Structures are given as structure tokens and as C-alpha cells.
Amino acid sequence: CKPCPDGTGNMNRQAGCRQKTNGKERGFLKNLEHVCYNTRFSHIYVERRIRNHPRTEQILLRFPQAQIVEIEHYKDVFNRHGQDGVRQHQAQALILAEKTDHFFYEGAPVCQDFGNTNFYYCSTMMNCIYDCSYCYLKGMYPSGHMVLFVNIEDYLEELDHILKTQNMYVCISYDADLLAMEAVTGYVRLWSA
């Protein structure tokens, strides 16, 4: 991002900055996103070990214009120090990763379990495409980017294993909004099958 050409150095969307082009004044803020921000998921980070996973391939086909960046581990991007989640959310990147352990977590006692004794949740996604003012996710993660674990088959396999010994009440969309990404992931359909 370059500072506003009026010399103030102010890039605030609400500052009312204006610039002159060929003697005509035009709204600088009108084009700010084209100057400063990429579009959502213009960059997709992919862990090397899941680059050829069928779901990874499927998701990448939905974003043909995205720049693909291979990484070793999602935490190298998602958990970096000094991130600005608010700005990142303006040009949110998608991080495709593999969850390798801890597929299910016991629900916290302060959460609604609806009378179920075996209350668990899982995180097939972390963060959200929305920016709701009331949502706790805004302050939960160090990053404004979204992580999607592509190996949902491992979650379902672990669930089948657990269900052989006990019933479970599982919250499948605890750390994200799965329905918002259903067109990309198909996860809600897979969970309900």
C-alpha cells in the first residue's frame, strides 16, 4: 500500500482521502481495495504433504486465479508472531492442511451440551469468512486467514471408532462456519451422511 497521494500518509478508509488524476479529482477510497488488498483466497497456502490429496485438488479447481504457495506446516503461516488479523481478513488467504491428531476435543463445561454426557467438538476449519461483530472468533486466533483441514475422512474414521464404545454429541462447526464454506468443502453433507 502506498500512502495517500495528498501527502497526508493516511490510508484509513474513512479518512476521505482524494487524489487528482489528469486534473480531475476522484475518490481514492473507491479504489482502495484494488490498491491495497487482494481478493479473498487470492493466495492459497498448501502443505506439501497434502498437495496431491483429492480434496486439495478439488478445492484448488474452485480458485483457478489463486496463487498457490507450498508450505511445510500450516502453523508456519497461521501462527506467525506479529500478524494483523483485521488487515489479513480484508484479503483472507486460505490455508489447506492436514490434521494429524486430536480430531475430537471434550466440550467445555461452560458450553451448552443439551443434556448430553459425551459432548465433544472438532475443528475441520479454523476461522471464518464472515466478520461478525459479536463473534468470539475475531480474537481467538493470531491470524485473519482461514485453515481448512482437507483430511475429513480421518475425522470420520475416528468418529466411527469412538462410536463403537460410546455415544457422542459432536459440535462440527465450533471454530468456524462450516455452512458458509459448504460450496467449497461439502463437509456438512459428509457429516450428515
Give residue ranges: language-model regions:
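Flexible, acidic/Gly-rich N-terminal and inter-domain linker regions that tether
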Residues: C4-G7, C17, G27-N118
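Polybasic, lysine-rich low-complexity intrinsically disordered segments
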Residues: K20-T21
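A structural signal for short, well-ordered beta-strand segments and their strand-loop junctions
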Residues: Y45, I68-E70, Y121, S133, ...
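Short, flexible loop/turn elements at secondary-structure junctions
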Residues: R48-I50, T124-M126, Y174-A176
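Conserved Radical SAM active-site core
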Residues: I95-A97, D101-D113, L137-A193
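Local cysteine-cluster metal-coordination motifs and their immediate loop/turn environment
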Residues: S123-M140
